[in-house]
Amino acid sequence: MKPSPAGTAKELEPPAPARGEQRTAEPEGRWREKGEADTERQRTRERQEATLAGLAELEYLRQRQELLVRGALRGAGGAGAAAPRAGELLGEAAQRSRLEEKFLEENILLLRKQLNCLRRRDAGLLNQLQELDKQISDLRLDVEKTSEEHLETDSRPSSGFYELSDGASGSLSNSSNSVFSECLSSCHSSTCFCSPLEATLSLSDGCPKSADLIGLLEYKEGHCEDQASGAVCRSLSTPQFNSLDVIADVNPKYQCDLVSKNGNDVYRYPSPLHAVAVQSPMFLLCLTGNPLREEDRLGNHASDICGGSELDAVKTDSSLPSPSSLWSASHPSSSKKMDGYILSLVQKKTHPVRTNKPRTSVNADPTKGLLRNGSVCVRAPGGVSQGNSVNLKNSKQACLPSGGIPSLNNGTFSPPKQWSKESKAEQAESKRVPLPEGCPSGAASDLQSKHLPKTAKPASQEHARCSAIGTGESPKESAQLSGASPKESPSRGPAPPQENKVVQPLKKMSQKNSLQGVPPATPPLLSTAFPVEERPALDFKSEGSSQSLEEAHLVKAQFIPGQQPSVRLHRGHRNMGVVKNSSLKHRGPALQGLENGLPTVREKTRAGSKKCRFPDDLDTNKKLKKASSKGRKSGGGPEAGVPGRPAGGGHRAGSRAHGHGREAVVAKPKHKRTDYRRWKSSAEISYEEALRRARRGRRENVGLYPAPVPLPYASPYAYVASDSEYSAECESLFHSTVVDTSEDEQSNYTTNCFGDSESSVSEGEFVGESTTTSDSEESGGLIWSQFVQTLPIQTVTAPDLHNHPAKTFVKIKASHNLKKKILRFRSGSLKLMTTV
């Protein structure tokens, strides 16, 4: 479609074999010839108009100079009689009035021309539309004909598109050139507010035409706009498409002020050089470069000339940057003009669409948006380790369902470990406080920090330690913390099951990690049930360390006593907290059950403690969670309420404060677990013991645990690292009798849970820690961890037990049941026990 020299060549060459090509070449040739003729006519017309404008300007200047001279002469001849002076003054006034009238008449003429221009433009638009309709119809017909006669003839000639481009485009060019040029000519003087529209129309007129014609029209329009805006028009000196500017009337563009190339010299309109300078290239570039300034000058000049309000209005129009001026600035490249115009149109249409942007954020409230993104935030920390990711996910699910706030906290967490800690603490706080238990883990953390700054500090220290121990543990812990918080709150009940599901794989991972020395994230369920304060050494190894932290945070909020704060220190409420992380997790539900006065819950806690370490334990944990939730609801125990939660979280402090020990004692392992794991090997046990010792030493060094609390947390076995001791503990556990409460708080724990006070306690702690480690290692000491978890529930300090006689530990023969359970779970466990 785009005319090219080839088209002209075709026209000159003998008829081509194809009729379509001949027809196409002929219209193109005619169009090119017509365009050249139009260009010449435009140039000639422009020259003549410029000359006429120059003459008119000179005439005006002559008259003005004459008036000035006469006035000067009159002033000089002041010696003359007053009457003659008066007569002269009257004559001068009359002349001035005549000049003013002339100016006014000229202004009125300009306004009329503008009106005519507008009318013509309207007519031109109508004609354009009609022509476009014709072209469209022709194209449609052409398409139909093409489908029928595609092989016989070229569709283009029959379409009439080329004919239209030849004739219709000629008519379009006529309409655009004649109508719009007249418009421009009439409007340029009046600040050509029509010129922008005209330019646009000219472009539209040129659209049907070939690209070359469009370029010519655009160029012409740009020049016209420049002239209208006061920019020097591209006159004869510019041989380009200025001639396309068809100016029917004397173009008032020559009445605009001229600015020299450097922009320093400004020639006001009524100047002798103006008419000639308008055509001078000296002012062309400068004026083109500063179309807006030219427009302003034009407005000023028009106001000076006309001095009328009408001209002022026109000036205002001219001063406004018109599309024409913008186009004139970019006229050097018609393609750029076209692109800019299209862009502006597109932007105009796209702006309203931008209102849809709010849809990107469903909630305008930033908090809600954060909540919506909380899952992402939670997952990011979880990414540290698979176990952590699962735990974080679970915690996120639990926390977010319970309350949207946790997601905000999640968003705030920088390290996953810190975040999980905060979330645990916050969740604990939320439990204590009416805040949604799972919701503001961060808020709960803040509350905890406020309520128990000391405990919070130890917890943070513990977390730091855990992080030092292994980054895996800290992410895991954070995940566990978040998971634990969901578990801990009854509202999180649904979330904990999910966590359980996640936890089972996590447990496996955690076991492996603990073997590696990095504790896998504690199953969210366990962590939820009993967030164990993370211990320096065992925490990273124990799955429940994060839970201990969470629980510790909860306990911190609820139990400010030194014991609990010490527990809250990274280790958790109890020294066993970390070791018992899994047990604590189970314990969490068990504690809840105890608080609720549900022996079944306590048993579940045992099972839960086992679960803590194993996938099956996850199921048990779920049961424990359910039972504990029920217990919370029915008993309204500490877990039922926010305070109850911390009590459940810190079994020792919580049990003592809330009489958890009673429930722990009351509950006999009623459920026979089918999900028991194999017992840990002696090597694993020894390793866990070593870990426990290290943690214990850290705790002691840090002074995290008060004397009474550290004892339960660090059971004698926790201090003991020998495998024989561990096996002895197991044996005593399986031994038969559960000694009531022994003098040692730790022994109380173990005795209540396992039947042998000392061995049980040491086992509980040792197993808790070592199990946490070995369980993550998949060593199979989950049974111990389960018991330990149960023990922590029961591991209420002796004073607590005494304070709460209802919670007094009951003597039970657990060895038989435990043996059966172990046998059900794995024969290797029993073998280990017997060998020990």
From Swiss-Prot:
Claim: Coiled coil is one of the keywords in the record: yes
Keyword annotations from UniProtKB, A to Z: Coiled coil, Cytoplasm, Deafness, Developmental protein, Disease variant, Neurogenesis, Nucleus, Phosphoprotein, Synapse, Wnt signaling pathway
InterPro entries: Dapper
Impact reported for residue 356 to K: In NTD; does not affect interaction with DVL2; does not affect subcellular location; results in reduced RHOA and JNK activation
Residue positions where Phosphoserine is found in the record: 237, 827
Annotated segments matching region Required for self-association: 92-156
Coiled coil: 92-156
Biased composition (Basic and acidic residues): 20-47, 419-434, 613-622
Pfam family, one: Dapper
GO biological process terms, semicolon-separated: embryonic hindgut morphogenesis; negative regulation of beta-catenin-TCF complex assembly; negative regulation of canonical Wnt signaling pathway; negative regulation of G1/S transition of mitotic cell cycle; negative regulation of JNK cascade; negative regulation of protein binding; negative regulation of transcription by RNA polymerase II; negative regulation of Wnt signaling pathway
Cellular compartment(s): Cytoplasm; Nucleus; Synapse
Short sequence motif named Nuclear export signal, residue ranges: 132-141
GO molecular function, one term: protein kinase C binding
Locus of motif PDZ-binding: 826-836
Positions with biased composition (Polar residues): 407-417
Keyword DNA-binding included in the entry's annotation: no
Effect of residue 808 to K: Found in a patient with encephalocele; uncertain significance
Assembly and oligomerization: Can form homodimers and heterodimers with DACT2 or DACT3. Interacts with CSNK1D, PKA catalytic subunit, PKC-type kinase, CSNK2A1, CSNK2B, DVL1, DVL3, VANGL1, VANGL2, CTNND1 and HDAC1. Interacts with DVL2. Interacts with YWHAB; the interaction is enhanced by PKA phosphorylating DACT1 at Ser-237 and Ser-827. Interacts with CTNNB1 and HDAC1. Interacts with GSK3B; the interaction is indicative for an association of DACT1 with the beta-catenin destruction complex. Interacts with GSK3A.
Disease: Neural tube defects: Congenital malformations of the central nervous system and adjacent structures related to defective neural tube closure during the first trimester of pregnancy. Failure of neural tube closure can occur at any level of the embryonic axis. Common NTD forms include anencephaly, myelomeningocele and spina bifida, which result from the failure of fusion in the cranial and spinal region of the neural tube. NTDs have a multifactorial etiology encompassing both genetic and environmental components.
Function per UniProt: Involved in regulation of intracellular signaling pathways during development. Specifically thought to play a role in canonical and/or non-canonical Wnt signaling pathways through interaction with DSH (Dishevelled) family proteins. The activation/inhibition of Wnt signaling may depend on the phosphorylation status. Proposed to regulate the degradation of CTNNB1/beta-catenin, thereby modulating the transcriptional activation of target genes of the Wnt signaling pathway. Its function in stabilizing CTNNB1 may involve inhibition of GSK3B activity. Promotes the membrane localization of CTNNB1.
Name listed for the protein in its UniProt record: Dapper homolog 1
Source species of the chain: Homo sapiens
